[in-house]
Amino acid sequence: MPETHPVPERIEAALDLIERAQPELNAFITVTGERALADARVAGSELAAGVSRGPLHGVAVGIKDLIATEGVRTTAGSRILGRWVPKRDAAAVWMLRVAGAIVVGKTNTHEFAFGTTNDNPHYGAVKNPWNPALTSGGSSGGSAAAVAAGLLDVALGTDTAGSIRIPAALCGAVGLKPTFGLISAQGVVPLAPTLDTVGPIGRSVDHVAMAMAALVPEGVGGRVWGVGEGDGRSNTLPPKPYTPSFPGLTIGVPEHYVFDRVDPEIETAVREALRAMEAAGAVIRPIELPELERCWEVGISIVRPEALAFHQRWFPARAADYGADVASALEAARDIPAKQYLTARRRRREIARALRRSLEDVDLLAGPTVPILAFPNADAFRPVLTGGELPRHAVTRLTYPFSLSRLPAISVPCALSGAGLPIGLQLAAGPRQEAQLLAAARAFEDLRGPWQAPPLAARIA
């Protein structure tokens, strides 16, 4: 008898989990069960015949519904594109399919990726798997929630101001924003094209490395990404030739910025993580980066005009088809003069130069991913933080620097709060230093120990 392979059974199990979780989590806009099972049978036959396309061969993945998928509607979380069925895959999706990944569906996103809560008026809010009364974060909230809840090992997201790292931190997943341009954004509905970045969210750093091996083919090979071929038979990861460690690594911490107006529990957890890395051999060095103080102002002065430039085909003529928050942001963008946008572009370059200079003296930068814990979506517009800062804006304060500088940054779960909510540690590196970043993040995972599953995982098991 020909050898059989368990890929179809694994994909069927993943689809079953998605179905059970959907009423409570709402992580998906579209589930592609029939096509996923057909692709799984092909992958199973290939693997049974000894043909391996890499570590993602036969692995279920989700795709943020901002990213085009051939023959599958891609809504961008909007009413306006609610019936759009692309004729071809986005470049990143094509790379995943070439690597043998099985796309099981399109994950929920904040409308047009223009927000940080994933409270979507057209397809419903994504719920946090640790507490469904709280936000998942966004805009890649569906991808982060699905991974954190154990529905998937890997999902694709996009990050313009923190949209991979924010929900990864709030949901307890690993989220990587690669160097700008490292992964093609072709086929992604744009938010701000000079900042939009495609990247993976995974259950662990190793899962993110597996995705990077597929998304950046020149990185395939254990020396770069630290993953082998895999055989698709189980969720067990292939052996890694590198040994993640901290001795000899210098980590810079811009303390006056990253610990300013931060929830005390988050500051405590991240400082404990830094002490653990120091005890493991890293050198922790406080640094000054005053240029970061203007990141939020610079960021919105770039994102809003670039978003408006794309949406002028529909806005304001179809303003009623937008959610209130996105319509408000686009309306505000109309008041940003060209001079302000051009000044912001210049200041973005100044911020990037400052961060790159700092990375000449240290190997990595570190701090919290977000300054606050997950909050109810109803509080997103309430100025409850120091200085009247809105939660929906606060969550981008620590992620914006690495978006504006176009540097790679990763969020790794580091602790749970007293209320049982995830806290994210953010690490950043120099341009195209993803391998070093992943190795350090993996070393931190080893120090931290196993990460527990959220309460939702037990309810749907």
Question: Which sequence ranges carry the predicted segments?
Answer:
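Structural helix-boundary/capping segments
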Residues: R20, E24, V98, A149-G226, ...
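Acyltransferase
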Residues: E9-I11, R41, P264-E288, Q312-A317, ...
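Small-aliphatic-rich amphipathic alpha-helix that forms the alpha element of a beta-alpha
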Residues: R356, G388-P413
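Short helix-loop capping/hinge segments that flank enzyme active sites or metal/cofactor-binding pockets
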Residues: H57-A76, G248, G252, I302-R356, ...
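Gly/Ser-rich catalytic/binding loops embedded in alpha/beta enzyme cores
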Residues: M1-T160, R275, A280, R357
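Short, surface-exposed loop/helix-turn segments at secondary-structure junctions
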Residues: R79, R83, L342-T343, A374-T396
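Short, well-ordered beta-strand elements within core beta-sheets of diverse protein domains
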Residues: M1-T4, G62, L81-V85, D196-R203, ...
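Residue-level signal for inorganic ion chemistry
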Residues: A14, A36, V208, I251, ...
